[in-house]
Amino acid sequence: GKPSRRPDAMEASSAPMNAPVHDRIAVIDFGGQYAHLIATKVRRLHVLAEIRQPDDPIEAFDGYRGVILSGSPALASADEGGLARAVLDLPVPILGFCFGHQEVAKRYGGQVEHCQREYGPARLTVSGSSPIFAGVPAESTVWMSHGDTVVALGDGFSEVGTSRVPGDDHPHRNAAIADDARRRYGFQFHPEVDDSEFGEKMLENFAVGICGCRPTWTMHRYVEEEVAKIRAQAAGKGVFLLASGG
């Protein structure tokens, strides 16, 4: 897929050493092209999102209120990607996109198979009443970019969305899956891309509605808090500052 605008210049940093001031969402970057865009879209909800790596120690995820798994060029059907399965057992809500969606399905007994690649807009049809789709219409456009698909679900999961690409008479099954009891969710599509009409609403449903994050984070507050940290750390010391290409 292609976002219609670039992510904000600010990149997500690793978790701060001090106790977090704001509720946080971890975005695990599997090498897909949109991990930082996911973090940007969550921050636009005034929720702090931070990029983590798949091989980060499980302790690095302490204190997060939820986890988002990004897409990846790897194939879930080939067991690529290097996700530490312990992450999927964290006692917080988890939402996967594309590759991340397939990893969620696999972890809980689902099956993933290689399929004909889908790329471009598709029509999403929502079913059921999962909170992940609260306020989202029954039909909307989403952005697809994948070569694997979830063909079977494990116990506790249900299909809450199917999709259809132009010219295809057969719906794509399991385009969205949910286990509301365990707070595990997956989207085969990319809600973070602007082509997904109600993607930001879906992200809000997850970060604020399901994870319970308070929307307290802003860029202005971030700058103020970081300046205060630097002043405290550098008090009475010389400072060596690198800027831009430095």
Protein language model regions, located:
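Phosphate-binding active sites in nucleotide-utilizing proteins
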Residues: 237-246
